[in-house]
Regions:
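Beta-rich carbohydrate-recognition and catalytic domains
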Residues: 27-153, 159-248
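Hydrophobic helical h-region of N-terminal Sec-dependent signal peptides
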Residues: 10, 14-22
């Protein structure tokens, strides 16, 4: 999968979204036996808003909030920061297991205050096994990923890698040593690169982060989609650097 992606990268300048919409379907080419799409999202930048919520749709376009718009998973029970952002959900290949990944972040602590992500696994969409991974703690010997330098592990998503036989998780990394000057002498432009890891079989751990894609400026919110007709993977992401001065 990694080699195929690096052979052909396609950029898509996407607007930032509050959540990650994904049909809870197996990632296969077979016709779907399922009738609805589940949207996992967070609603706003407050601590109450930064919690997992669900919405349901029959067509993938029009959604109705579930649980009267209230959280379905309390962030203070799963996140080190007691808040989450960017939930991404998918149905596993076995058709019975659901996986969800998200950013472990509380935005009122600042946009450069996030050091990790969350892995979750469930068979009923209600009761979740969860693991919060703090990168400086999990990878203490990895250069540049110390708590002083690392400031963002954003918007994780997963995709099954057939060649490796594991789920690949990919996410945006922001580090202070990558920042570059702007016309404002008091401001440096944040710089993000897309990284990836592989998730353990029990969905509780990840391998050491590896570089997936360096756009040459800040690239966030990656989304990898397989095109079965062309038999290729396409990477969409948001350009957070050239198109705008992002002062967070």
């Amino acid at each position: 999968l990694i080699m195929k992606l690096k052979k052909r990268m396609m950029t898509g300048m996407l607007a930032a979204t509050l959540g990650a919409m994904a049909p809870v379907l197996a990632q296969t080419a077979e016709p779907s036996p399922y009738s609805s799409y589940l949207f996992a999202f967070f609603s706003n930048n407050s601590p109450y808003g930064e919690q997992v919520r669900y919405a349901l749709s029959d067509d993938g376009y029009n959604y109705t909030s579930l649980n009267q718009g209230r959280p379905v998973v309390a962030s203070d029970t799963i996140a080190l920061k007691k808040s989450i952002r960017d939930p991404y959900i998918t149905r596993g290949r076995d058709g019975k297991t659901f996986y969800m990944v998200m950013t472990d972040m509380r935005s009122d602590e600042g946009w450069q205050s996030n050091d990790g992500l969350i892995l979750m696994k469930s068979t009923d969409l209600i009761h979740w096994q969860h693991t919060a991974i703090d990168f400086p703690t999990r990878f203490p010997d990895l250069t540049g990923f110390d708590r002083k330098n690392l400031h963002a592990v954003w918007a994780p998503q997963i995709i099954w890698d057939d060649e490796v036989g594991k789920y690949m998780i990919y996410y945006s990394i922001g580090r202070h040593d990558w920042e570059y000057p702007t016309e404002d002498p008091n401001f440096k432009q944040p710089y993000f690169k897309l990284f990836y890891s592989y998730v353990s079989e029990d969905f509780t751990d990840i391998t050491e982060p590896k570089l997936l894609f360096d756009f040459g400026t800040a690239a966030i919110d990656g989304d990898i989609v397989y095109n079965p007709k062309a038999k290729e993977y396409v990477l969409f992401f948001k350009d957070e650097g050239r198109s705008v001065m992002n002062k967070g």
